[in-house]
């Protein structure tokens, strides 16, 4: 069996997605997500100019050897562009292999470890009242876990909170927009938000919060301590992820569970965090960390230290990644939770899929492969549109972490 064709499909049904399609000489094909939010074209070039020419003629069943070839053979290892491109190849090959076996991907991975997959969604509001209403709507849809983000008084725009659309999309401008940030206003207000949410909805719903890398370690420790009475499921991305020892200091000061990893692209990015048990959940994504092959290694390593998975699952990842992640979630023993932001009807039409949602939980479906396809004719109707992520400045003008 040989790979005879591979192509990159770029489409924008409401936001940009990059998809790799690999075709074999038996007519079986697989697809993988290659979307890197705000840097999509860089992955397209990496695939088309460097990886696809080498991929043609290889046996698609040799997934591990192909992965090692592109990782070790690149010399310039790791990095978001290269690992996203490698992930697209890896997921497409797993899709092919499962189709060859005529079984859903989770069966090929080892079979299911649970009957359904717990997910969380986002509840965002420009103020406290609208945030409480967003939580109520999410709860009414059946979600048992909800990430809560709220506008901060005195800050014009806050991460996670939409200002002009129903669905929050941070990559919203042709060139990076500038947002203003105040750490002190944020730290003074957010504990009150969670106090109000707990008072309104009680102790039984799981609550999560994303800091989005905005704090120093001691500031994050302060926030984690202040949130302890409200028993969060996790506090996410509390500090910039480059210095893993930052989490050691946070851990020393608070029992609020910690999650990190959506910007990671290698097991080496999270090795110290996991083995020192400085985090509780690893959020590394299949699409940005080299695919299923490396995520298996990360999850297996994490299981040795009681760290569970909590994959990133916002709409900056296509339904292709969501489908692959759900099959992984179904199988992985140390599963924690799966993020879910609903794709639009437009997006779902371009990417028909077998996975389903019911009462706060997902199942990946029984279709062979990862169960997600792409309608190429429909995808062609939505051309690429450049969209950049914002940048942050403090109130005095200092550039800050977005």
UniProtKB/Swiss-Prot annotation:
InterPro entries: D-mannonate_dehydratase-like, D-mannonate_dehydratase_GalD, DgoD-like, Enolase-like_C_sf, Enolase-like_N, Enolase_C-like, Mandel_Rmase/mucon_lact_enz_CS, Mandelate_racemase_C. Binds 1 Mg(2+) ion per subunit. Transmembrane segments: none annotated. GO terms for molecular function: magnesium ion binding; mannonate dehydratase activity. GO terms for biological process: amino acid catabolic process; carbohydrate catabolic process. Disulfide bonds: none annotated. The active site is at 159 (proton donor/acceptor), 212 (proton donor/acceptor). Its EC number is 4.2.1.-, 4.2.1.8. It catalyses: D-mannonate = 2-dehydro-3-deoxy-D-gluconate + H2O. Mg(2+) binds at residues 210, 236, 262. Its cofactor is Mg(2+). Substrate binds at residues 37, 122, 262, 283, 312, 316, 339. Keywords: Lyase, Magnesium, Metal-binding. PANTHER family: D-GALACTONATE DEHYDRATASE-RELATED (PTHR48080), STARVATION-SENSING PROTEIN RSPA (PTHR48080:SF6). Belongs to the mandelate racemase/muconate lactonizing enzyme family. GalD subfamily. Has low D-mannonate dehydratase activity (in vitro), suggesting that this is not a physiological substrate and that it has no significant role in D-mannonate degradation in vivo. Has no detectable activity with a panel of 70 other acid sugars (in vitro). This is D-galactonate dehydratase family member RspA. The gene is rspA.
